[in-house]
Amino acid sequence: MKQWLLLCAAALLSTSVLAETAEEKGLRLAQEADARDAGFGDHVADMQMILRNRAGDESVRQIRIRVLEVQGDGDKSLSLFDEPADIKGTAMLTYSHGLEPDDQWLYLPALKRVKRIASRNKSGPFMGSEFAYEDLGSQEVEKYSYRYLRDEPCADGLQCWVMERTPAYEYSGYSRQVVWLDQAEYRPIKTDFYDRKGDHLKTLVWSGYQEYAGRYWRADEMFMENHQTGKSTLLKWSNYRFKTGLDDGDFNKNALARLR
């Protein structure tokens, strides 16, 4: 009897999965990816940002990153620019949310003032890079609707789920995004971004994943290519440290001008 019940349960589960719609599967995959990264608390890292124009000329920026996990809301993040000298001291603070607009502030030392980034401007480029302001907030599940597309091989011999996500928040610069998520660890491998007209705008590729604190995966490099301008931005990450003791006081917009 017990074996028969187990077989029935397995059959019901299989039927449930098979009956799953493309939208339900896409949402489930996004939720699982989010759940696997929950509980990191906080982390700090160093980042090198390399900007390349169409001719291949480069400019390099050195940035320190701090991130705080927030229960029941999006993460808080702080970017502090150390180089080059002409932008040293620039800082960007982000409070990410679900469907509510992210709160973002930019401190510009040359002007000695903190500038709030308006919701309508989140699709603009961050500090001349190919990353938009909206790319830099934490990617809360609620920000998008999802649709599973297919399975296919992806980078480094991995197998990926491919899904489409459509921004559910106002003023996004994207009509949709197509995401490749690896089936081993639910890590993003590639994202294609489509502009408001539906044209292919950019591609972001993650590579060199490392595991930290026994379960948290972070990419060593993130390469964003703009197919419409020929420009690109490479982010190179290093010196990750988790659970360093950061708290809300380390993410205060009123202290941006005093940060070092």
What would you call each of these model-derived segments?
Residues 82, 93-95, 103-107, 113-117, ...:
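Gly/Pro-enriched, hydrophobic low-complexity segments
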Residues 14-16:
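N-terminal signal peptide c-region/cleavage motif recognized by signal peptidases
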Residues 19-20, 24, 142-158:
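Long, terminal "pre-/pro-" and other extracytoplasmic accessory regions
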Residues 1-8:
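Bacterial N-terminal signal peptides that target proteins for export
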Residues 259-260:
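Short, solvent-exposed mixed-charge patches
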Residues 65-69, 147-154, 207-209:
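Short amphipathic beta-strand and strand-loop transition segments with alternating hydrophobic
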Residues 21-110:
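N-terminal mature ectodomain segment of secretory-pathway/periplasmic proteins
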Residues 47-49, 65, 79, 146, ...:
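Preference for bulky hydrophobic residues occupying beta-strand positions
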